[in-house]
Amino acid sequence: MNEPQTDETQPAPSESGPRPALTRRRFWQLGAATAVTAGAVPLLSQTTAGASTTTSRTAQDYYDRAAELAGDNPVLKSIVSALTPGYAPARPPAPAPLRIFDNVAVVSVGWVSAVAILTSRGIILIDALNNPDEAEQILVPGLRELGADPSTIKYVVVTHAHGDHFGGAQYLADTYGARVMLAPADWDLLATNNPANAPTRDLDIADGQKLTLGDTTVTLHHTPGHTPGTVSPFFPARWRGRTHTGMLWGGTNPPAATASKETYLSSALTFASRMRRADVDIELSGHPFADYGLERMEQLRSAPNSAKNPFIVGTSGAQRWMKIVETMLRGRIAQDQEATTATTTALAATSPHTAGCC
């Protein structure tokens, strides 16, 4: 059996510590500094998720700030759109599979993708498309087209318990003996909901776990919010003789409950801090609509000999992408609070008055 190597597994460092006071003036000074430095010190990153929601700034203030941070950058504009309330992503046709790095391949059905980390001892697959048919008819042939042997898939790391990410996992387990990995909270979610194509419970992912296969180590971080057990990995990516550090953000759309959005915000802050320490300079998403993913694949495909790789955004670019996630989440939380306030005010205005005495 291909058990994950756990000798290097350790929890990620705690992000707790003293929280400096933050005035409204300081709030916007930090925002201005972030726009110039593109991620040197995240806006409000030193506040807790709960405390950040007490500001008088409106949801639209946050949305405007996110748009300002994005500017004309299509990668950043994509995540602003993806986190905007009411956004409905397009369903483009599936692109041809592509090695976006020497050791990283993407096989996509257009609106959701699987990412293969190619190692000296086989494949670590991140997500498995929508269903067994897509795994068999798109994922497996796509890997073969890129010179990767699907029979060497050793692990399927499922970022979260939604069908468009786990759908093909059990097929890969049954066909190739791959081990399926998911955070405990999302294994529990599958057990509760019992959705179609759910994989049989296999390996739990610990926060900060290091999964080593051959010459490659992938670090798996718990980033709950999109679901209770969302996971986001760091991975090495080789390009033109240099090894970079990439990340894949495991969940996109904010959940309905305000408390879950606050959890999502806390995860984004923690993950961005870990990214800084790891010098992450590559940003990926399992949903290409959230980061201009399909377009960047075509840029790379059309210029295969270019020294530049559009997925290498630099440490500041990766931080700015996460800064926009943070800022949009603050806006979504503020919008929830505004809706609650409006409802309370309306009820108070229409409720009958009680007697004033006796």
Enumerate the predicted regions with their spans.
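Short Gly/Pro-enriched turn/cap motifs at secondary-structure boundaries
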Residues: 95-96, 105-107, 200-202, 222-226
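C-terminal regulatory/interaction regions
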Residues: 2, 28, 32, 58, ...
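Short catalytic-loop micro-motif centered on adjacent basic/acidic residues
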Residues: 106, 125-127, 155-158, 220-222
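Metallo-beta-lactamase
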Residues: 123, 130-132, 200, 210-212, ...
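Active-site HxH/HxHxD metal-binding segment of metal-dependent hydrolases
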Residues: 56-68, 104, 133-137, 143-210, ...
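N-terminal secretory signal peptides
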Residues: 1-22, 33-41
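Conserved beta-strand hairpin/beta-sheet module of binuclear metal-dependent hydrolase folds
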Residues: 90-146, 150, 232-253
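Zn-dependent metallo-beta-lactamase
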Residues: 42-44, 48-122, 132, 356-358
